[in-house]
Amino acid sequence: MSMQKTNKTPLTLALIVAIGITGAASAAVHLSDDGQGQVLIYPYYTTRAGQDTYLSVLNSTALSKALRVRFNEGKNGREVLSLSVYLAPYDIWTAAVVNTADGAKLMTADKSCTAPALPVDGKSFVNFAYWGAAIEGIQKSGGDGATTSLDRTREGYFEIIEMGTITNTAINAAITHASGVPANCAVVQATTMDMGPASTLVMGGQSARAFKATGGLSGTASLVNVAGGTDFGYAPVVLEAFSPSLAENIWDYPGSIFPDLTFADLTSSVLYKGNVVSSTWNKGSDAISALLMHDSIINEYVLDDTTLSGTDWVITMPTKRYNVPVHDKEKGTDDDTQLLSPFTSKFWGRGSGSYNGACEQIANFWVPPDSWNREGGNYNGLGFPGDPFIGQRLCWETNVATFKDAQVLGSANAESVPVPFEHGWVRMLFNSVGIPVVNGQTDGNGVVHSQAAHSLTSVNGDTYFGLPTVGFMVQDFINQNAAPGVLATYGGNFNHKYTTRISRLPP
């Protein structure tokens, strides 16, 4: 065979040399370079504008896996549904997020074991994590000033985390398929089931504890609009060596808010200009931020009048919820909350302008994103003719930058981006500095800065510039010359390109 386990990519080899290991699975947490790993971050789900989101996760290994699947709404990253999924060797789990009269729900015809069991007619997303009176500070639940409506569940992002591998013979037999159906899902759905690192449960004469996560997970997602005839398919961002090397497993009970991205190894490895930057952190979510930090996003746009084309960019910041506190901005300086790097604004979901969400500036507030046409013509002035510029911000955890308000995805978290050309490309910069903030901005190394900036510094002094983002571009086209009665709508999507800057090496 032309592809073998012994073939190593440049990133894997660089990590092996830099960290002194014999296999990438023992390395610090890093981005996977082969599309498989322990954690999958899916930048976007939506049920808006006639779309449903179809998803899959594949276990390509000979080991059974315990997974945590978590859906987060897009405004402030609050959990709207989580469940455990148990995959037998070589198994795939598939599901869909679909629209309801009130919000969104998860449906599946897949037979793989979940805990809890999913109803035949699906499980509705809930608003428990953002319901009630506003609670100031960095919280996982409570009001945040934004709407408590279930409509908020209709778009966001989701993550799948490997909690561990299953070595218990009886549990393995229960989740393994026979004639297409697992033998006994009730085993893993029982309230007495405990596979955690402190478990004393014995089944079939063996400990029920899960063993270390080993990776080998991959996945897909598709934003499907049946009536519109479009399908925007994408692959998730994949993290490898997520679990700390000394952790036996990170399993937790169904319904728990854990594990999440804070459970990551406290050392991150990033390949930068041919060298591996290995940084140490006080919390796991900062290690994940380091992997995703970019000081600019680069991608294309198409706004062709003939084909009625439109372009949206999805931009999700999956570690924002760990660093941005809720604070009623109408209280002004009466503020006991603490903002954490690399974000520069606190969250309040009610109001207008900078009071709405936790807004991050795109480049200089008064200067639009740099834009080029297809012939290399550049425009980066103080405003586009016919498009008064008022400053672009990304205010939510999951954002949609919609070019000239094209609204391809119909997002409620959209920010319209003015551009001077019909076709071209944009470089969206994240380089804010000197942002006033009450109580300052606490950096990744514990230093409190009097003003906030788009940067994150590790315990060992590496500074990463920009914001931690994942996402992609979508564009649609309509063939107005197609035969009568023929649906002639087309769609395409493309991953963002990025620039990265780390202070350890020359910029």
Regions found by a protein language model. Give the residues of each.
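Gram-negative bacterial Sec-dependent N-terminal signal peptides
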Residues: 1-26
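Intrinsically disordered, low-complexity regulatory regions enriched in Ser/Pro/Gly/Thr
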Residues: 21, 48-49, 62-63
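A structural motif detector for short, solvent-exposed N-terminal "entry" segments of globular domains
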Residues: 28-58
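Beta-strand-rich interaction surfaces with strong enrichment in secreted/lumenal proteins
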Residues: 29, 82-85
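Short acidic, flexible loop segments centered on an aromatic residue
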Residues: 58-78
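Long, compositionally biased low-complexity segments
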Residues: 85, 96-98, 102-507
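Solvent-exposed, conformationally flexible loop/turn segments
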Residues: 88-93
